[in-house]
Amino acid sequence: PWFQDPGVQIHGPGRSKIIIGADKIDHWEQYLDLMVTSIVANGGRSCINASSIWVPAPARGIAEALDERLSQIHARPLDDPEAQLAAFANPEMPHKLSALIDAQMGNAAQDMARGKNERVAEAGGGTFLNPTLIHVDNYEHPLANGEYLFPFAAVVETPQQALVERIGPTLVATALTEDEQLIQQLLASPHVERLNLGPIPTNKLSWDQPHEGNLFDFLYQQRALQRMAG
């Protein structure tokens, strides 16, 4: 009901991403900690959490290594000092989200985590979703740009020359590349709200550079004013 209301500013999913350039793809192991942090920090519930990793080359090895790390994170009671996941207030929600993901899988995606940890889990009286990593080889797959209220990410393969035009709306993009052409394409992209150049986790913010502007900009109109003295 607020979509057409100019007095309401609507913020949707972040669909934040990590992009690995062709010049860095052979060194992807160096960025595993960065990827895990970007996906899992704050329980994976923030719009600035990475929900996809975009790469220009076959990515099964990346998906397997990343899944191995994510599968070590699982539901724990909320008072456990090792707990990293958030429970859902509505215990039915994890089951619905898990079913939604399964319904969109199809033949072009693979859930790397199945067989290690069940996605829906109970711990300490709470209901959780364990981290889920999807590997897709087609950017048009519905899960390539999916975002859910838990540590979920898709590893997406797409040629670098078409990558920027295919990533879609992106709140935060961390670009692991020194390729100036790719950097310039990302700088010029209207899809990217916040661009991190180099190994900066997607969830690391600089508060003096708000990626969606200041509330002042929305509530007030700036105007230049001059008045003759006297």
Language-model segments: residues:
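ALDH superfamily catalytic-core signature
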Residues: P1-N138
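Conserved C-terminal structural/oligomerization subdomain of aldehyde/semialdehyde dehydrogenase
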Residues: V36-T37, E68-Q72, A121-G230
